[in-house]
C-alpha cells in the first residue's frame, strides 16, 4: 500500500480548511485516511502560529514507515525542520530561445551598421 501524507479539504465554500492526513494514495482526496497528523488553515495570517499545526512525532513515524509527503505538505515539513526539500534550480529555463537570440543579434548588427554609416557620412561631410 503506497502511503501519502497529504491535504484533505474541509470547511465551507470559499473558506477552505485542510487536515494533513496519512492516506492510501489510491483513496479519494477527502476520503478514508489512516491518521490525522496536522492541519492547515490558509485563511489565517502567514505569521499566525495556528496556521499550520503539525504532530511532529506522528509525522516522523509515518515517514519512517515509508509515507511520502506531497509537495505542499513537504513545504510545511521543511519549514518546521521535519524534512528536507530539494532546492529547485533550472538555469536553462531562464535562457532566451534560439529565435530570440537571433533577433537580438540581428538588432545589434543593424545598430552597428547604422553607427558605421553615420560615422562615414560625418567624415565625408568634413
From Swiss-Prot:
One of its GO terms (biological process) is translation. Residues 99-113 have a biased composition (Basic and acidic residues). It comes from the Bacteria. Keywords: Ribonucleoprotein, Ribosomal protein. InterPro entries: Ribosomal_bS16, Ribosomal_bS16_dom_sf. Residues 87-126 are annotated as: Disordered. Belongs to the bacterial ribosomal protein bS16 family. This is Small ribosomal subunit protein bS16.
